[in-house]
A protein has these predicted regions:
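Non-catalytic beta/alpha edge segments that cap or flank active sites
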Residues: 1-166
Length: 166
């Protein structure tokens, strides 16, 4: 089929202001290149709920992205509002996938429990919140990788390819 089209959105005041290098976004873009997927856009936004929500909405509604992966803003600091912004614009919540990300991360570190990241869909686009730490991003990619092609197929209306269970 057609390669998956992915948007990477780094949510970080520090990266947005140029004070911090975006290592986590880089891990995702490297993975996209290695996997043979298409990087549609790689952007950095500040930890501002409306800015994040508007960006997610316009990327999903453009029809240009199958998947939007965010990194950052999922923790407990007062500026961490990525899940809240995501919640504003998703149409369907996918708590099972959020659990998969968290469970996988917790095999590496108990601190994965502190990520409040959401996963959900808007139209034909899957949106997943990854943590801001490079290690957390790596763990999330490993956890979600196997599901992405099937989810994208389903979101695009290809329902006949259900993996069969005996």
């Amino acid at each position: 089929g057609v390669p998956m089209r992915i948007v990477v959105l780094t949510v970080s005041d520090g990266c947005f202001e140029g004070k911090r290098q975006d290592r986590s976004g880089q891990i995702i873009t490297d993975w996209i290149a290695t996997s043979g997927y298409i990087l549609v856009e790689n952007d950095v936004v500040p930890d501002e709920k409306d800015v994040i929500a508007d960006k997610l909405k316009s990327c999903a509604d453009s029809g240009l992205a199958d998947v939007i992966l965010t990194t950052g803003g999922t923790g407990f600091s007062l500026r961490d509002v990525t899940p809240e912004a995501t919640k504003m614009i998703i149409e369907k919540d996918a708590p099972g996938l959020a659990n998969v990300l968290q469970d996988h991360g917790m095999k590496k570190t108990p601190f994965a429990a502190l990520s409040r990241g959401l996963v959900g869909t808007r139209g034909h686009t899957l949106i997943a919140n990854f943590p801001g730490s490079p290690g957390g991003v790596q763990d999330c990619l490993e956890a979600v990788e196997m599901f992405l092609p099937h989810i994208v197929d389903l979101l695009n209306g290809h329902t006949q390819e259900h993996p069969k269970k005996d």
